[in-house]
């Protein structure tokens, strides 16, 4: 609140601050603000989960816009702004910032701004929370323990994957990722060319591979080299359906959903996102060309 008071000194716009009290509260607060009908700008102060809730609440409201004041450990959606991502720490730069409508991912009725995934990566990331409940376990150690457990249990599972009506070859896959943004999992970059306002999702599908293979490929995948890895399937489209043999953990911007089927599509709703003047999410390759 003190940072807000300092940034807003000398301005006459009304503002209010609220602290979320339980899961989903951020979405309720954002929706309530948007439903008033007046122009409103919502600053999600927290991590990717906080941003996810604010976006879910403001989705579909033309009078509302959302941004992210990063206070989490990942802040993955902002990574697509490259070196300019640090400018989101400057509240003054966000006060009169331009805004643009961006797409959203809809998965089984829930919304995500950045990435939806199922498989090896989702089980590691979401499973870390299980180990954080243990005494003296936190941060990187929790993810390491989750990775060990996932590798021991098996890194690929039976899935049937269909994208825009095309049934992908294979009966088992290591991970399946639908991207509106470019980064997830604390900096992994599966889709370096994804943009959040083109009306399409970028899909990355890794077929069943051995434990040794995944360990040798994970570095290239993390650095945006998925397109250079043989057998990885890349698609750009509007919807995907995944049928799992049993209920699995699904990652939605770091939030968890458990289901045996995924229906993923570009949502009919959009959300206005505002960002510091002079920044943008155009991939470097497209700028050069």
What are these regions (language model features)?
Residues 20, 60-177:
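Catalytic core of DAGKc-family lipid kinases
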Residues 117, 121, 177-191, 256:
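Glycine-rich phosphate/pyrophosphate-binding beta-alpha loops
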């Amino acid at each position: 609140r003190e940072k807000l008071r300092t940034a807003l000194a000398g301005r006459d716009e009304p503002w209010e601050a609220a602290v979320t009290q339980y899961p989903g509260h951020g979405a309720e607060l954002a929706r309530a603000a948007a439903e008033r009908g007046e122009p409103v700008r919502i600053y999600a102060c927290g991590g990717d989960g906080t941003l996810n809730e604010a976006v879910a609440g403001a989705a579909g409201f033309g009078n509302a816009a959302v941004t992210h004041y990063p206070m989490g450990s990942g802040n993955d959606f902002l990574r697509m702004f490259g070196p300019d991502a640090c400018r989101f720490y400057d509240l003054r730069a966000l006060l009169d910032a331009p805004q643009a409508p961006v797409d959203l991912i809809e998965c089984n009725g829930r919304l995500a701004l950045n990435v939806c995934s199922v498989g090896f990566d989702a089980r590691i990331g979401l499973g870390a929370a299980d180990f954080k409940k243990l005494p003296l376990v936190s941060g990187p150690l929790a993810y390491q323990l989750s990775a060990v457990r996932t590798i021991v249990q098996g890194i690929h599972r039976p899935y049937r994957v269909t994208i825009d009506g095309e049934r992908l070859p294979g009966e088992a896959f290591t991970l399946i990722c639908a991207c509106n943004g470019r980064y997830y999992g604390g900096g992994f970059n599966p889709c370096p060319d994804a943009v959040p306002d083109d009306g399409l999702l970028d899909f990355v599908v890794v077929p069943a591979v051995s434990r040794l293979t995944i360990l040798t490929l994970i570095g290239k995948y993390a650095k945006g080299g998925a397109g250079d890895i043989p057998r990885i399937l890349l698609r750009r489209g509007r919807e995907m359906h995944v049928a799992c043999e049993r209920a699995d953990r699904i990652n939605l911007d770091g939030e968890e959903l458990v289901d045996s089927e995924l229906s993923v599509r570009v949502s009919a709703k959009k959300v206005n996102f505002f960002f510091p003047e002079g920044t943008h999410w155009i991939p470097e390759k497209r700028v050069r060309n």
